[in-house]
Amino acid sequence: MRSRETVTYSLVFLLILSIFSGIYGPEKVLELDEKNDVKIESISKSNNLIDIPSWKLNDKWNYNGYLDMVDFIVDSGVNTNLQTLTGTLESTVTDIYITTVDNSSSLVYKVESEGYYEANNINLDGQPGDLEVNMDTVSIIRASDLATVSQEATIDINFCRDFLWFCIDVSVGTLEVDQSYSPPLEGYDFPISVGEAWSQDYTATTTYSGSSDYVDIPEDTVSQRTANYEVVSQGFSGVNYASCATSYNISSSNADGEDTGYKWFLSLIHI
């Protein structure tokens, strides 16, 4: 029979996997460093349309935010008071080059990110402690429309279990997830304007690797998916940055109409 600790760490691993296996993008609530430097190439002169930004090498975004765990916990049935993981993410454009995307030569950006997320004083299946997640990601973004070609993430998961007046640091596991999209995932449809909606059918190919003493690494998958997007509003994003008053909220859902998230797009920077 597996020990209670083993069950707890297995649940931690599976919860983190459920979040990161499909989406690695920035969180729902973000703050940006005002040192961002992004050039805009305008296609339209209309004040009501936002066009494709042109990134430069070493462009950088700093995020503060959270990962919402509630829906995943409810679906899993895990007994825990964990609701969110809070932390930071720094993204940098590290390369710009031409590669083949769906049999066509395309200019792409390579964006590398480093993130750290934590939840302190939580209880997982009767085990109190702190949950820590370190994440490194690499995203390949098509320059012509900011569509995501592929994403890969390396995720280190640690649970510091409370014991008397100190805690025991347990390495729950390391997970590597590589995901590619065909055609590339079009989270934007430029030029952007309120009320615009679009859908996309695509194939997601996901490969897993890594190690854990508590749970098996998942099998690779190939799945057919549908993504629906809508620009639902324009206004203040909640981020304390000079240009955020004119942000565009882009919401997304799956083929069943279930909300899968939202993001903000700004005329000078995007989040």
Show the residue positions of the predicted features.
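Short, cysteine-centered beta-strand-loop-beta hairpins and adjacent loop/turn segments enriched
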Residues: D68-N79, Y116-D130, T207-V215, S253-E258
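Short helix-loop boundary/capping segments
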Residues: S150-E258
